[in-house]
Amino acid sequence: MSAIRYELIKTDKQTGARLGKIHTPHGTFDTPMFMPVGTLATVKTMSPEELKAMGAGIILSNTYHLWLRPGEELIREAGGLHKFMNWDQPILTDSGGFQVFSLSKMRDIKEEGVHFRNHLNGDKLFLSPEKAIQIQNALGSDIMMSFDECPPYPASHEYMKKSVERTSRWAERGLKAHERPEDQGLFGIVQGGAYEDLRAQSAKDLVSLDFPGYSIGGLSVGEPKDVMNRVLEHTTPLLPANKPRYLMGVGSPDSLIDGVIRGVDMFDCVLPTRIARNGTCMTSSGRLVIKNAKFTHDFRPIDENCDCYTCKNYSRAYIRHLIRCEETFGIRLTTYHNLHFLLNLMKQVRGAIMEDRLADFREEFFEQYGFNRPDAKNF
């Protein structure tokens, strides 16, 4: 029996978007869901209790980074990642593939795996499909990812075809290496760049392997948003309706809503936490850069329509002061707000699906947020 089970609750009559639940060994979470990213077994500046309070049903951790520090064996010794970081709800781990291809300037891709340099100290390392699974088995996450290649955008059709074929072979090898299928659900990752024929081939290959869930990778890597939406429209119908669909690395409010409309259930991104550290906040009326001088004497909350801890207790003027002085508490406050904003947005999206009005909600949100303006700024 699979460790992961998807339950469809309702389909939105306006868009076909899915409302559901995903059942895991560490509990159930509602979908669509945004997953905060805890790269090194922590969501930067946030406690597990705070994440639960804001409605995070699942968080993500990074296999590559935990492999390097503190090492998967230490985490196994601690009783697994859940005990190590004191998080008793579901955890998803990536395979490390994206970090290998994005952080290492020197890498050599072979059929057996990837030889590359440790981005911390320059040491030579090797990561294979089997090793990526072995590390994740030691971590004990509820949902694991297959090892895949993440080609940059744009890439030629010829290169992408070879990459997709290799990723499919790696997925099969990883599935065979998986030692804990009853405790951990392993997802296959659909690749293919912007090429619809290669996306179809990748999806066909992976569906034939009968994974308990499917990820859509290789998007949000520099391609225009209309390209991403086109690829999603083509790809999600090729994936089983009775299994979860996870769009990797996407976290801007507009892309979350558009992804849900195109059949996606799960999302993750460092965006809300990364921009928070620079003092950029997501609000119901658009992006707010708290460092701007116009907020020096502004004693309103970041977002007057927000009921998060930050907005109920602190002013723009105070948070601006903290961020400008590089005080950690300022980063905590903006991080809390941004994560709460996205998690609450997904709660609103789920409510709109339940009421069969997601297309209307999208129009209202885009109008209020400013995405419909010709000069709209992307995050």
Curated annotation (Swiss-Prot):
One of its GO terms (molecular function) is metal ion binding. The active site is at D94, D268. Keywords: Glycosyltransferase, Metal-binding, Queuosine biosynthesis, Transferase, tRNA processing, Zinc. Its cofactor is Zn(2+). Pfam families: TGT. Pathway: tRNA modification; tRNA-queuosine biosynthesis. The keyword Glycosyltransferase applies. Transmembrane segments: none annotated. The keyword Cell membrane does not apply. Residues 249-255, 273-277 are annotated as: RNA binding. PANTHER family: QUEUINE TRNA-RIBOSYLTRANSFERASE. Homodimer. Within each dimer, one monomer is responsible for RNA recognition and catalysis, while the other monomer binds to the replacement base PreQ1. Catalyzes the base-exchange of a guanine (G) residue with the queuine precursor 7-aminomethyl-7-deazaguanine (PreQ1) at position 34 (anticodon wobble position) in tRNAs with GU(N) anticodons (tRNA-Asp, -Asn, -His and -Tyr). Catalysis occurs through a double-displacement mechanism. The nucleophile active site attacks the C1' of nucleotide 34 to detach the guanine base from the RNA, forming a covalent enzyme-RNA intermediate. The proton acceptor active site deprotonates the incoming PreQ1, allowing a nucleophilic attack on the C1' of the ribose to form the product. This is Queuine tRNA-ribosyltransferase.
